[in-house]
Amino acid sequence: MLSILLENPLLVLFLVAAIGYPLGRIKIRGSSLGVAAVLFVGLAMGSLHPELKLPEIVYVLGLALFVYTIGLSSGPAFVASLKREGIRNNALIIGMLLVAAGLVVGAQRLLGFKGTVTAGLFAGSLTNTPALAGALETIKHIASPELRELLLAEPVVGYSVAYPMGVMGVVLAISLVQKLWNVDYGEEGKRLRLAGTASEALRSMTVRIAWPGAGRHTVAELARHEKWDVIFGRIRRGDSYLLTGPQVRFQPGDLVTAVGTETELRRVAAFLGEVSEEEITVDRSEYDYRRIFVSNPRVAGRQLGELNLFENYGATVTRVRRGDDDFLPHDDMVLELGDRVRVVTHRDHMAEVTAFFGDSYRAVSEVDILTFSLGLALGLLLGIIPIPLPGGITLKLGFAGGPLIVALILGTIGRSGSMVWSLPYSANMTLRQIGLVLFLAGVGTRAGYGFVTTLAKGGGLAIFAAGAVVTCLTALATLWIGHKLMKIPMSILIGMVAGLQTQPAVLGYALEQTGNDLPNIGYASVYPVATISKILIVQILLTMLM
């Protein structure tokens, strides 16, 4: 059997993926390794024979795909995180990552770890695969050819031993702190919703206009003056229907449909009149609605307000669904391939509006090879450019940092002329998963034999203990400083801690604890900065310690 595996690396790749992926979904006390289990299966497979390893191009390709797709989807969130409280939140995260780096260096000095193992310890205790990738890239550039294979295995040892506690330690820290501080997530959620911080599910409501002064202002003027965060749909005026547009004026007695959060809809209804139990959307004889896929490249990457839907088609978009989330469609919202827009328009115009957006499921399942390859090539080129740092240190972003930074920029831009940089949501997630599996399987098999050899020499327990200390102290310090000194609500803060770890398992635990979506706000606001910072820090650590 071993000889068959040695002669068929492609078989090894898919065996590792097929065994590792389901293992990663097994939960123990609410936590699981996720796709990282592929790494451990790869290590086990590679430990069987020194030549049982996948070609280097496998993990390099996987790495490039993984970080590039992350960057494309995180670009807008990254830019948004630099505004308002995002600057404060990201400053805390960067500070804590520097603290973690200091703790790792202290462990290295105290316990005598190699610089390469220390870099893996940093990536594992903070459960960040791109950081491990960045470490491996740096070693490839600075290590001598005869030592390269041996040195490439050492960060994986540190990462693999520290990783499990990198998940469990944070969960334990959150559990301990919320009990000590008697955190009431339900009450905190209510308070934040009143302050307009929380994200609630969207719903529709029928409002009966009773305010006598409604006709003195257009809908756009009212929404701007009262700062309403809702979208108005159709109006029933007597026995006739019309669609709400920016210049439409409500009249007393109108029945109007509105889409928004429960809190905001109640506020609008109290101002304009009262909530009505009538469902005017049931009558679809004149105005109809449907969800339409955005598959037209000429629409993707453009702001919704630029499309002039009401003026050109007499249509209004009341919701945009991206992935599994619904968003209110404001004029400055940039549409992406794969978005599903809910459109209300006259039945006679529905076919025309549908053709305008595209509505082709097949089209949104495909990838624009030109823009995808060009963007990835630009990222790889950036990654090989040496960047001089103070102290004579030269930094290269490598196959991890280069594509990530370029993808963040392109994901924010959305399109350049006729070229759409973003990927359809489904295609992005598929390529991301494939890339991550390729990377983990490749790294695991290539480091497996060295992993076993290193552990056989001793030192595994010391790495595990050091990783546990780094993880727990960093998480506890973040929670204490964030909540006690910076007054960040715990519901958001534990999401930020999950973002600090770039760990979906911790985010899942946080969501279970709060019972609302507030942790998602903290997670999304710091994830891109945390990922980039870890990649840069781990490369600086390696350059200093090797």
UniProtKB/Swiss-Prot annotation:
Record carries keyword Repeat: yes
Record field: transmembrane: 4-23, 30-47, 57-79, 91-113, 155-177, 372-394, 399-421, 434-456, 460-482, 489-511, 521-543
Keywords: Cell membrane, Membrane, Repeat, Transmembrane, Transmembrane helix, Transport
InterPro entries (UniProt xref): AAE_transporter, RCK_C, RCK_C_sf, YidE_YbjL
Topology versus the membrane: Multi-pass membrane protein
A Pfam short name: TrkA_C
Signal peptide location: none
Molecular function terms, GO-annotated: monoatomic cation transmembrane transporter activity
GO biological process per UniProt: potassium ion transport
Broad class of where this protein is predominantly found: membrane
Location(s) in or outside the cell: Cell membrane
Record-linked PANTHER family: K(+)_H(+) ANTIPORTER SUBUNIT KHTT, TRANSPORT PROTEIN YIDE-RELATED
Name this polypeptide is given: Uncharacterized transporter GSU1016
Organism expressing this protein natively: Geobacter sulfurreducens (strain ATCC 51573 / DSM 12127 / PCA)
